[in-house]
Structures are given as structure tokens and as C-alpha cells.
């Protein structure tokens, strides 16, 4: 199957475990996803600037596998926005913590009998934003899984995600988190 065929046929997988809890003046979204891939393969997908643009909503100016300053370049169609991506923890292949602008992403990778469990803790502005964020990460991690399966789809991020089921995921995660969905086109 070609990348264009895989992309055309993409549909979001089932909802994943998600919760949002107060974290000081912000909210912490926790998103859990199981993969059949090794921790090392997942670590590479999370840290390698050659792999990030194939699935993530950003790329990086360097490998994120070491602590120190980094710049993340958020991608939405033709728009590029540079954000702080400073890595504060990098314990290969199990823990990665870095900034994404004002947010903090903490990725925890655990080996399981079936492969790997990835837990993402992402700080967001408010509880309603958590549902939007969960929908976005859901799609990105579906794409990462396909990439690791050697069946690349290509990134589905930003406004383009609307064409691939993002709105429905946003509504479903909003219901799961007990909040009203936000329409990002009205923000």
C-alpha cells in the first residue's frame, strides 16, 4: 500500500484512556496508548528529528534524546511557528520531558508483554482544551503507529486533521472528559 493509499484510507482508531486533572493554574491531560513496538523504536519516533515530521505536530532543530535547549517547529499546512522545546529529562528509552511553548510534555515508555505502553502527560490551559489536545494526539499517535509498522500515512496535523475525523474525536473525548467541545475554527 502506498502512502497516499494509506492516507486516503485512514480512520481514527478506538478512543484511548484519557483523563484531565487540575495542575496548579492549568490542567494535566494524561493520554495512554499501547503499541506492539519496542521501547527503543518508540523512543526514536519521539526524539529523532527525521521521524518527528512524519507523525508529530512539530519537528525539532535537534535530536530530543538529550537534555538541553531545543526549538520545536509547529507545523500547520504552510505555517511554521518556532516554540521553546527545552528538554528537561531524557532517560532513553523510558522518559522524555520537554517544553512545547508554554506546555510541558512528559512521555513515559514502559515495556509490556505485548510491546510498549506510552503515557503522555501534557499540561494545557484548561479542561476543555484537554479534549482537543487528546483528539490531536490520538490522530498523531495513530500515524506514528503506522509509521512504525512501515506503512507510513504522513502527518495529519492542524487544519488538515478536520478532514480525517478530528471533530468526531474531539466530541467523543469532550464527552469522556465531561466538557463541552470547542470548535477551533471559532477560537
Model-identified regions with their sequence ranges:
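A conserved amphipathic terminal alpha-helix motif
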Residues: 1-11, 124-186
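Hydrophobic ligand-binding cavity/cleft-lining segments
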Residues: 1-59, 185-187
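Charge-dense, helix-prone N-terminal extensions
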Residues: 2-5, 82, 113
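Beta-strand/loop substructures that line and gate deep hydrophobic ligand-binding cavities in soluble
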Residues: 13-18, 22-23, 88, 95-148
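Glycine-centered tight beta-turn/hairpin loop motif at sheet-sheet or coil-to-beta transitions
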Residues: 26, 78-80, 102-104
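Hydrophobic residues positioned within well-ordered beta-strands of beta-sheet architectures
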Residues: 29-31, 83-85, 118
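Glycine-rich portal/gate segments that line the openings of hydrophobic small-molecule binding cavities
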Residues: 34, 51-99, 180-187
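Tryptophan-centric aromatic hotspots in well-structured domains and transmembrane helices
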Residues: 43-46, 55, 72, 100-102, ...
Amino acid at each position: 500500500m502506498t502512502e497516499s493509499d494509506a492516507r486516503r484510507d485512514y480512520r481514527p482508531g478506538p478512543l484511548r484512556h484519557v483523563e484531565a486533572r487540575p495542575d496548579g493554574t492549568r490542567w494535566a491531560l494524561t493520554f495512554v496508548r499501547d503499541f506492539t513496538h519496542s521501547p527503543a523504536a518508540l523512543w526514536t519516533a519521539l526524539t529523532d528529528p527525521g521521524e518527528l515530521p512524519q507523525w508529530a505536530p512539530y519537528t525539532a532543530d535537534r535530536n530530543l534524546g538529550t537534555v538541553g535547549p531545543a526549538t520545536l517547529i509547529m507545523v500547520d499546512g504552510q505555517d511554521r511557528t518556532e516554540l521553546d522545546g527545552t528538554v528537561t529529562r531524557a532517560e532513553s528509552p523510558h522518559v522524555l520531558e520537554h517544553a512545547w511553548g508554554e506546555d510541558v510534555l512528559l512521555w513515559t515508555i514502559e515495556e509490556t508483554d505485548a510491546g510498549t505502553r506510552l503515557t503522555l502527560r501534557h499540561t494545557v490551559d484548561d479542561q476543555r482544551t484537554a479534549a482537543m489536545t487528546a483528539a490531536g494526539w490520538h490522530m498523531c499517535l495513530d500515524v506514528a503507529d503506522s509509521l512504525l509498522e512501515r506503512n507510513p500515512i504522513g502527518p495529519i496535523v492542524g487544519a488538515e486533521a478536520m478532514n480525517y475525523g478530528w471533530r468526531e474525536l474531539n466530541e467523543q473525548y469532550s464527552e469522556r472528559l465531561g466538557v463541552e467541545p470547542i470548535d477551533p475554527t471559532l477560537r
